[in-house]
Structures are given as structure tokens and as C-alpha cells.
Amino acid sequence: MAKLEQHLTGDFGQIVEFIHQELMRQSMSISLEECSKNQIQGKRIELRVYERFSYAGGNRTSLTVQFIETKDGADVCGIATGGSQAVFWKINTLGESAFLETLDVAIRAWNSTGHA
């Protein structure tokens, strides 16, 4: 399992859509499996679960991305899971790391557009 947390500044809805589009653009096999939208104490929260085939690991991996609205943007947390092999310990976690890297690339792209 691999995790990435980052605060992004800008419009919450634009952040969510931009990250989604960047993730979809980076992989031919990626799909948005499920999405949940809620509001708690006036703050929007969106949870998205993506899945893709990992050529690096030769298996399927998932990436869960949570967006929590803040005063000036969104707190983003991405957790990649799956793709490891073996029963009692994790080996071959290449797919998880590679999938999480796509989120990192998307976040850097958002920041490079002048929103950081």
C-alpha cells in the first residue's frame, strides 16, 4: 500500500475534475469504479475509486482518492492498493507505486497551472 497526501488551492470542483481528467489521460486501462459525494458541516467530500491494469506488476491495482473541501481548495489523499503477490507478505508492489505516481503527476500538473 502506498499513500500520498497534499493540499491544493483553488476551486474545489475544478480541482476534483482536473485531477480526474489527468488520471484518465495517463492510462489506457484506467476506469472510475465508484464515486461518493457527501457534505459534512458544510464541507464537500468526494471519494473516488479507480482501477487499472498494471503492466509493471502484471496485475490490477486500485487507487482511492479522497477530496475534502477547505477554505482555499482541497485536501487530497490517495491510497493505492492491490497488485501485490504472495499470501503472508507483500511482494511485487510495483503496480501500487506506479499508480500512485499518476496521482502525483496530476497534482504537480495542477500546481504548475498557477494554483499552488
Can you say where each PLM-predicted feature lies in the sequence?
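Hydrophobic transmembrane alpha-helix bundles
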Residues: R25-L32, Q66-G78, L103-V105, H115-A116
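Short, Lys/Arg-enriched charge-dense amphipathic segments
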Residues: L4-E5, E51-T64, F99-V105
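Ser/Thr-rich, low-complexity intrinsically disordered terminal regions
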Residues: E17-L63, K71
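Beta-strand/loop substructures that line and gate deep hydrophobic ligand-binding cavities in soluble
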Residues: G57-I91
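A conserved amphipathic terminal alpha-helix motif
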Residues: A86-A116
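Terminal, regulation- and interaction-focused segments at domain boundaries
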Residues: M1-S27, R108, S112, A116
